[in-house]
Regions:
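Core catalytic lobe of class I
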Residues: 2-282
Length: 282
């Protein structure tokens, strides 16, 4: 497939469409040549295509094995900086949900893939469920895989624009309304902090408020011993924050001044397929 090799060597932004069996086509790509791969293969026993293909296997395991053969080739052609997005839905057999997406994902992890996210695609709507004894399903898994820990990820381009700090009644207020007054009061009245810890906490809080005023940071939270819940865990073996709280009596959580990252639940309503004669899965 010299046309593929020639296309990869160019700087063209026009897409090249290659038609064929995915496994056979991928085998003709050179190693480490693709920046990103996105696919949504036919789900098991969900759709009958004219030319057959994946998804019509006799068993879930056979389907998973066939998928993993393709995934192996994706890993080979993907650059170390590249990403692989896999959207896959689940199926039922003998009344049980089979867990096919996670069976595939766990096997990929065993094969050396790095799973960065399981993004939940919340479709908001789905087909009418004829089943009287279980809930309808309106979500699918969208796995974000990489094959190297040094992958390309342009975080700043997808952040939500942060709100700005402001001054109210002579006091600087963070983007979400934190002025430090409540924290100062908690420090002063605390029976869990020593006099030295109170002094250090107040000093550090004033420095943080100064950073807010200068625009260096836009928002923060302060956790004070026995005043706020410890982040993640109270165990000093499991949480560095818990150890900091035990040793110092307080710690700070800072918001990224460039904004927050999107979460791992994406609300995307599928294209309306009513009155269509064909199903397109590019």
């Amino acid at each position: 497939m010299c046309i593929v090799s020639e296309y990869i060597r160019t700087d063209s932004f026009f897409p090249l469409f290659v038609q064929g069996d995915s496994l056979e086509v991928l085998r003709r790509f050179s190693d480490n040549s693709v920046d990103c791969c996105i696919t949504s293969p036919p789900y098991w026993q969900k759709r009958q295509y004219e030319n057959g293909g994946i998804g019509l296997e006799d068993s879930p395991q056979e389907y998973i094995d066939n998928l993993l053969c393709i995934v192996k080739e994706v890993k080979r052609v993907l650059k170390p900086t590249g990403a692989f997005w896999l959207n896959i839905g689940d199926s039922y057999q003998n009344k049980t949900r089979l867990g096919i997406p996670w069976r595939v994902a766990l096997k990929m992890i065993d094969d050396g893939w790095i799973l960065r996210n399981d993004v939940i695609w919340n479709k908001h709507k789905g087909g009418l469920s004829p089943n009287p004894d279980r809930f309808g399903s309106v979500f699918e898994d969208f796995f974000f895989f990489v094959k190297s820990d040094k992958y390309f990820f342009d975080a700043d381009s997808i952040r939500s624009k942060p709100r700005q700090a402001y001054v109210k009644n002579g006091a600087v207020v963070s983007a979400t309304g934190v002025s430090g007054i409540r924290y100062k009061r908690q420090i002063e009245l605390s029976t869990s902090l020593t006099a030295e810890e109170k002094k250090n906490a107040m000093s550090q809080l004033n420095l943080v408020l100064a950073r807010i005023q200068s625009g260096e940071i836009s928002d923060f939270r302060m956790v004070i011993r026995n005043e706020q819940r410890t982040t993640h865990s109270d165990s000093v073996k499991l949480s560095g924050r818990a150890k900091e709280l035990k040793d110092k009596g307080f710690y700070f959580l800072f918001y990224n001044p460039k904004g927050t990252m999107p979460n791992d639940v994406w609300d995307i309503i599928p294209e309306d397929s009513q009155h269509r004669k064909m199903h397109f899965a590019p």
